[in-house]
């Protein structure tokens, strides 16, 4: 963003950009209304109720944009001077509502201003998170914390309805191109408050949007597939999770190393469940060495090492929200261990004692025969092992061919 000398210059620059009415000018105005831009730190812009003062340095020719800018200055004052994120969040919602009512709903033959709207929504999420932190520190605890995210979601959803009902089809006019960005905004909010079920109609709308999908920005497509993949992982849909996360990783710019790393945090467990283990070089390249020991232990079928690896790097995995997901890798670890036992025995009838001895060898001493049978029965039910239990003879009878199918073939069935 170019240097802003004073408040008059600030209004002038926004006013001049409004005349252009292009997507590029919308991008530039969005920066002038961003809470993370350099201008936000300038003390001369930290003004409360600027719109009500009589000493206005400059009024934009666009009255609605002018009002939005004045409210933005009020937000800057609340954030930097009053240190009141709750009030800031409330004002930001007013901005979103005003933008919806006066711009999205009334300016029917244009959409150049959508980058401004995207920025306003992103800042609303940031303020909602800050307000939630402030509220959780009050005496009332977390009782009202989610209300900030919910009020943000409500405001964005109202805008979503406005955009999807737009009758225009032309790329330079239709507001439907905002669908994917708003879906991503709501994805992030619902992840925060654990209400991913509310995303079902939004996902269905994207699935059925037809040629419109090609008009969405690649950045939004990458983000959407990342969020969709994360949700699918937690839903247990490994095929959809892999599809979404692989798309996100491949289309994320090479220079965006931090974003690729975020994608891999979820793609690695998905690939492991499908039997594809990441290389040590990949983990090291993206600073994900926390996975190294987990990967090695699962491959070796060493349950004790899996538990130790999860314990050692538990804080990292919990922060990423994948600790419980990684715990489910124990099933694959059992499968890999039992496959090794079957290869050592070299027969289709394997005594259960052999499996129990192997478990003790890898540090699992608390599994009795009944629990062992239950573990094997689950592996058979999940089609990770082809065979049956001969309970009376205390043996596992495995198929003569492909007794341990590839995990990817099992997950695709």
UniProtKB/Swiss-Prot annotation:
Domain of life of the source: Eukaryota
Family matches, as InterPro entries: Csn12-like, PCI_dom, WH-like_DNA-bd_sf
GO MF annotation: an example: double-stranded DNA binding
SMART domains, sorted: PAM
Record GO cellular component, one term: transcription export complex 2
Residue intervals of the PCI domain: 222-403
Single biological process term from Gene Ontology: post-transcriptional tethering of RNA polymerase II gene DNA at nuclear periphery
Residues of the signal peptide: none
Similarity field: Belongs to the CSN12 family.
Protein name: PCI domain-containing protein 2 homolog
């Amino acid at each position: 963003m170019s240097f802003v000398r004073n408040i008059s210059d600030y209004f002038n620059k926004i006013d001049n950009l409004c005349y252009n009415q292009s997507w590029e000018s919308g991008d530039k105005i969005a920066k002038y209304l961003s809470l993370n831009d350099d201008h936000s730190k300038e003390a001369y812009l930290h003004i409360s109720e600027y719109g009500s003062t009589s000493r206005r340095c400059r009024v934009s020719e666009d009255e609605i944009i002018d009002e939005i800018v004045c409210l933005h200055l009020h937000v800057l004052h609340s954030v930097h001077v009053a240190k009141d994120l709750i009030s800031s969040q409330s004002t930001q919602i007013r901005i979103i509502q005003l933008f919806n009512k006066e711009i999205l709903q009334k300016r029917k033959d244009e959409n150049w201003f959508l980058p401004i709207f995207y920025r306003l929504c992103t800042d609303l999420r940031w303020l909602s998170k800050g307000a939630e932190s402030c509220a959780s520190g009050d005496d009332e605890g977390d009782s009202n914390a989610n209300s900030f995210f919910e009020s943000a979601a409500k405001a964005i959803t109202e805008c979503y309805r406005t955009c999807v009902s737009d009758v225009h089809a032309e790329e330079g006019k239709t507001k439907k191109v905002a669908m994917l960005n708003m879906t991503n905004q709501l994805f992030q909010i619902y992840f925060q408050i654990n209400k991913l079920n509310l995303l079902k109609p939004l996902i269905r709308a994207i699935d059925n949007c037809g040629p419109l999908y090609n008009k969405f920005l690649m950045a939004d497509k990458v983000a959407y597939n990342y969020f969709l993949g994360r949700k699918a992982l937690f839903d247990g849909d490994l095929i959809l999770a892999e599809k979404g996360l692989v798309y996100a990783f491949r289309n994320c710019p090479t220079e965006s190393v931090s974003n690729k790393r975020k994608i891999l945090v979820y793609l690695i467990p998905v690939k492991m469940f499908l039997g594809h283990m990441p290389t040590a070089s990949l983990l090291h390249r993206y600073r994900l060495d926390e996975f190294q020991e987990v990967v090695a232990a699962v491959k070796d079928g060493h349950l004790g090492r899996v538990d130790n690896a999860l314990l050692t790097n538990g804080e990292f995995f919990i922060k990423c929200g994948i600790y419980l997901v990684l715990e489910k890798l124990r099933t694959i670890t059992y499968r890999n261990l039992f496959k090794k036992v079957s290869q050592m025995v070299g027969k289709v009838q394997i005594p259960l004692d052999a499996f129990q001895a192997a478990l003790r060898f890898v540090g699992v001493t608390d599994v009795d025969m009944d629990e062992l049978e239950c573990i094997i029965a689950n592996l058979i039910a999940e089609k990770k092992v082809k065979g049956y239990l001969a309970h009376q003879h205390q043996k596992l009878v495995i198929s003569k061919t492909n007794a341990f199918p590839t995990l990817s073939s099992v997950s695709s069935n």
